[in-house]
Amino acid sequence: MERFRNDLKAFVDELYEGDKKVLVYGEGAKHARVMLIGEAPGEQETLMGRPFVGKAGKNLDAFLEAAGLDRSALYVTNTVKFRPTKRSAAGRVVNRPPTQEEIRLFLPWLQREIGLVDPEYIVTLGNVPLKALMGKAAVIGQVHGQLLDVSGRRLYPMYHPASVIYNPGLKQAYAEDMARCGKMLQEISHNTAAHPAAPFAPVI
């Protein structure tokens, strides 16, 4: 994973020369059975150098705990590894969604990261990682909470934990999806046999 990080930093430094992008790498168990993939780091994640430590991260941690899932046993990362920003009307630097170009540039690196972790289950958080791995036609509102098979991996789409902040009406659906995920993983936890490695090919 260290080589992956060094290679990614060199790639970004060359691509965004002079822009001083701060990368936030994935973290967690080296060969976690479950990999959580978000969209991109925010302000707090960039300051602390860790994924999901801001308000959305606190939501995620609370739901993981309620579902009986130990974050330290998972691997958590983002599709785009730096914070996408824009200037607000008031002149403040604020978050923005990753562009299609940013997603395209980081997709091969996400694919490589998935190969290194080699998870049995991938939980996508929000539309960005879902569309990156399943194609632009995938819609979170239609597939959330369903276990899907994508290129030999089991993929479980969920709303992004930040969505609960901006749309409280999604809280129940998010909690139900997380509880279903926790129950599903606990039911298969007795099966500790190594799963065969499968190359992951995202749909573009």
Could you say what each language-model-derived stretch is?
Residues M1-I204:
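A polyanion-binding, active-site-adjacent surface
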